[in-house]
Structures are given as structure tokens and as C-alpha cells.
Design a protein with these regions (language model features):
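Short, conserved "active-site rim" segments that organize catalytic pockets and cofactor/ligand binding
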Residues: 1-20, 42
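Glycine-rich phosphate- or other oxyanion-binding loops that anchor nucleotides, phosphorylated ligands
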Residues: 2, 26-227
């Protein structure tokens, strides 16, 4: 079994890369793919870059070139629900695009308007979060290419699909994984509330995600060990 583990920013994968054993790094298509073992399992870890195009391209490379048989994407997101707070995690049961013409996208394989996280990976993520003492919600993740940092945009997305969080890669990863028949799950820690304060924290003040990254590394490592 080969696990493909992804993040959008270097900070989201660097700590995990440091935990790998028997590491080799293979550059391909502008991305460094770190091949090694984690908890005795074969993994390939990479930083895809931000946005849907980067995420989709990197997912396909993980599957086609590196033989990934399960995909785990871990990163931060903007919170859209009162059920959880900053630092809590959304595990993607449903992942979708709020900004796409879905009746056109679903005309091609995998013929879906939204994507479903793999039940085994979701269960493993829930157990890993519980073990790490992290509050987790199995819910809906919305993916768009624009950072959501104002109340008007947040309200529009809420009215359209009522997601639990918003981010910029998950649906693209999930779409490509589904197209290839590869199990996938998206994990997101809440860094902000997808409003003006979120823009200030992430864009202006360059929010440090070190605390989440340490937690995410434990969660992903525990998942891989259990699977």
C-alpha cells in the first residue's frame, strides 16, 4: 500500500517529511515528491501549491507516476459553522465546488456534482483526532480558487451550499481521486472564520500554522499507522 500525502503550503508538509525514513526526493513537474516510510508504510509526501489546478495536477502525478493507492490531504481552512472553532478539524464527508457549473462538470467521469470521502479513511481520521485530543467534525468542505476573507462572500457561499469550511484545493483532489478510483480524504483545521478577521490574520499578518502542523502531523501519522 502506498499513501499519497499532500498539503498546499510547505509548512503543511515539512514536519511530516522530517518524520520519514529511507527518504528519497524526486522532483517532477515543479513539485518535490518525498518518498519514504512512515510507521513502516510506504508514503509519498508533497506540497502541491495553492489552488485547484495545482491540487489536481499533483494528485494525478501521485497516482500515475508514484502509484498512490490512498490520498490524504491536510491543511487549513476558513470556518463556516458554529459547531466548531479555531483549531478544530473538519473531515470531509462531502467535498464540492461552490463556484462551478456542476451540471457541466458531472458530464464527464466520475460523473459527480460532489465528492465523498472514503469511509475507511474518515474513520481513521476520526480515531486519530480523538487520540490527539482534537475536536473533529465530519462534514462538508467547499473549494474555490479565491481566498474567502469578507462577510459578503462568506454569506453567498453559505446560501449556496452551507459548507462547514472553505478552502482552495480539496474538491480538485477529490475529483481526480474519484476519477481514478482512488480512496481519498480531506482534513482541514480551522485557522480563521472566513471573514474580515481571517483576511487580517492570514493575508496581512501571515498567520503561523506551526501549532496546527504539529497536530496534523500526529493525526496523519496515526492514520497511516492504523491503516
Amino acid at each position: 500500500m502506498i499513501f499519497g500525502i499532500m498539503g498546499a503550503m510547505p509548512d503543511e508538509v515539512d514536519q511530516l517529511c522530517a518524520k520519514l525514513e529511507n527518504v528519497t526526493v524526486e522532483p517532477y513537474g515543479g513539485v518535490d515528491y518525498h518518498k519514504g516510510t512512515l510507521a513502516g508504510k510506504q508514503v509519498v509526501v508533497c506540497c502541491a501549491g495553492m489552488g485547484k489546478a495545482n491540487a489536481a495536477a499533483t494528485t494525478q502525478v501521485l497516482i500515475t507516476k508514484f502509484g498512490a493507492e490512498k490520498i490524504i490531504f491536510s491543511g487549513i481552512a476558513g470556518n463556516m459553522t458554529s459547531k466548531i472553532g479555531i483549531g478544530d478539524v473538519v473531515i470531509g464527508k462531502t467535498v464540492l465546488y461552490p463556484d462551478a457549473q456542476l451540471d457541466m462538470i458531472c458530464q464527464n467521469p466520475p460523473f459527480l456534482k460532489e465528492y465523498t470521502g472514503d469511509p475507511e479513511l474518515i474513520a481513521a481520521a476520526e480515531k486519530a483526532c480523538a487520540k490527539a485530543g482534537v475536536k473533529a467534525l465530519v462534514g462538508t468542505i467547499a473549494t474555490g480558487d479565491l481566498f474567502v476573507g469578507d462577510s459578503e462572500t462568506k454569506a453567498a457561499i453559505e446560501a449556496k451550499c452551507a459548507p462547514d469550511c472553505v478552502e482552495m484545493e480539496g474538491a480538485a483532489v477529490s475529483q481526480v481521486a474519484a476519477k481514478n478510483g482512488v480512496p481519498c480524504v480531506i482534513l482541514r483545521a480551522m485557522s480563521d472564520n472566513a471573514d474580515e478577521d481571517g483576511h487580517e490574520v492570514l493575508v496581512v499578518k501571515k498567520f503561523s500554522i506551526a501549532e496546527y502542523v504539529a497536530t496534523a502531523t500526529r493525526i496523519v501519522a496515526a492514520m497511516v499507522e492504523a491503516l
